[in-house]
A protein has these predicted regions:
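Helix-loop-helix hairpin linking two adjacent transmembrane segments in secondary transporters
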Residues: 167-215
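C-terminal ends and interior cores of transmembrane alpha-helices
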Residues: 101-118, 348-362
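Cytoplasmic membrane-interface "Motif A"-like loop-to-helix N-cap segments
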Residues: 89-100, 334-348
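Extracytoplasmic gate region of multi-pass secondary transporters
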Residues: 42-43, 268-323, 327, 383-387, ...
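Hydrophobic core of transmembrane alpha-helices in multi-pass small-molecule transporters
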Residues: 106, 119-137, 365-395
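Extracytoplasmic
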Residues: 24-55, 138, 288-293, 387
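Cytoplasmic helix-loop-helix junction between adjacent transmembrane helices
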Residues: 127-169
């Protein structure tokens, strides 16, 4: 009976841990989905702006729309590196909530331009730059929070693959919401997602628990006890056991490892190759994010051109494919224990998927939907895997003795480098599309090929390691 008591106590602690983990996973999922939803309106309203809203109408319209994309993405990429450094040192809950509220404000400002009759290119560019800066804090924060709660999970790839579907879910929600209200004026396409992200920012501020220690939970002690440890009582740092909260907070801060330096993080094994791979992979993914509705609107399907609203809604098929692609990549990488091999496989298969979509997607609606789904599946698979499971692996690897305070910096380096490519893709598309969409798809295929090049050595090392382990 005496042995049963500690075991029962450990089981209760494990139950508390699991419930808190699910809550954190759900809240961060919703938070980052709202970031992506608020980024979707520019792609939905592109065709409307290019038709009759100066300064985006006329022959230079596509160029200026591309410049609008690059204003956001270049600011996002530049600020991302600083945001990761800040997230490793700041209160993650407050920083994430502030970023969400500020993102809502910048998106609302863009929507207000419709109602106020603003036609200044400088205004749109400034609003996009401000939006990019404040949104850059979102990713390092959510990755660090999830890493705090799931950093020791053996099925990290699967967990992260499912969780990272927030990217595609957010894109889908943003597309549907923006397209649904587009008929009332394009300003509403910005205002509705702005309200959603601001409201969720308040929820994050009130309810998010950024670290298990903040909830009085010691993950390592609980796992040891449940896996047949010494039988001693599991250490719970809060609620039932804490006597002096102020003293506890001081002790918790004292136990935290030092945050890793920016250049030190770049030198960690695997960080640079995956970062540059994501540069080209994200270039492709974000070209679809920002230009797919425009592409669908201006390319007939079964001989018919779709409306602005129908084009926006149809584009969500790419993101639905991306959801399943990200989950599949996470499952496969966990099963074979090879992140680089999995990413390389998806990148390789995305090349024929893009060729098929461009060549046969216009035959019928069924062809368009099926091939768009296939393209989204393979394009978003490696992008999802690298930004989540790979970044978490690299941010907690043995070289830094599992220092969880490196997580935000490493994830910011990887996603920030990818975001430079994300800025370049839509910008190039704005210029190249005037020469024909075949040229755009050629650019995308070249980008995927270059992404593959950066993974060749890592994939080879993983294969050799697996073969050696069997012998």
């Amino acid at each position: 009976m005496e042995a049963a008591a500690p075991a029962s106590h450990a089981a209760a602690a494990r139950g508390r841990l699991r419930s808190r983990q699910y809550a954190v996973l759900g809240l961060t999922f919703a938070a980052y989905a709202s970031f992506h939803a608020s980024r979707k309106p520019p792609s939905i309203v592109k065709a409307v702006l290019s038709a009759d809203w100066a300064p985006f109408s006329g022959p230079r319209g596509p160029h200026r729309l591309g410049e609008l994309d690059v204003a956001f993405l270049s600011a996002y990429a530049a600020a991302m590196f600083a945001a990761g450094h800040l997230a490793d040192r700041a209160d993650l809950r407050r920083l994430l909530a502030a970023a969400m509220l500020a993102s809502g404000a910048t998106s609302a400002a863009l929507g207000a331009a419709y109602f106020l009759g603003v036609h200044s290119l400088a205004f749109f560019l400034a609003a996009q730059v401000a939006s990019g800066v404040v949104q850059s804090a979102g990713w390092p924060c959510v990755v660090a929070v999830v890493g705090n709660w799931f950093g020791h999970a053996s099925s990290r790839g699967t967990i992260m693959g499912v969780w990272n579907s927030h990217t595609s879910v957010g894109n889908i929600a943003g597309s549907v919401l923006s397209a649904a209200v587009l008929e009332f004026g394009w300003g509403w396409s910005f205002l509705v997602p702005a309200f959603v992200i601001a409201a969720l920012g308040v929820v994050v501020l009130v309810f998010l628990i950024a670290h298990p220690m903040d909830a009085g939970l010691d993950i390592e002690a609980i796992e040891v006890e449940m896996n047949g440890g010494s039988g001693e009582e599991v250490e719970l740092l809060g609620e039932d056991k804490k006597e002096d909260e102020d003293v506890l907070e001081v002790e918790a801060v004292a136990e935290l490892p030092r945050a890793i330096g920016f250049l030190e993080a770049w030198r960690l094994p695997g960080v640079a190759p995956f970062a540059f791979c994501l540069f080209f992979s994200k270039l492709v993914a974000y070209t679809f994010l920002y230009w797919l509705p425009f592409y669908i609107r201006h390319n007939a399907v079964a001989g018919q051109f779709l409306s602005h609203k129908a084009s926006g809604i149809l584009s969500v098929v790419f993101d639905i494919g991306g959801v399943l692609g990200g989950i599949s990549a996470g499952l496969l990488s966990d099963k074979i224990g090879a992140r680089a091999v999995t990413s390389a496989l998806f990148l390789f298969l995305s090349i024929p998927a893009l060729i098929l979509y461009r060549t046969y997607g216009s035959i019928s609606m069924h062809h368009n939907i099926g091939l768009m789904f296939l393209a989204g599946y393979f394009v978003n698979g490696p992008y999802s895997l690298i930004t989540t499971a790979v970044a978490t692996d690299l941010g907690t690897q043995d070289a830094i003795k599992g220092n969880s305070r490196a997580l935000a910096t490493v994830s910011a380096i990887i996603d920030g480098t990818g975001s430079v490519g994300a800025a370049l893709g839509p910008l190039l598309t704005g210029y190249i599309s005037t020469r024909g969409w075949n040229s755009v798809f050629f650019m995308l295929i070249v980008s995927i090929s270059l992404a593959l090049v950066f993974l060749i050595r890592l994939a080879k090392d993983e294969i050799v390691s697996k073969i050696s382990a069997r012998h």
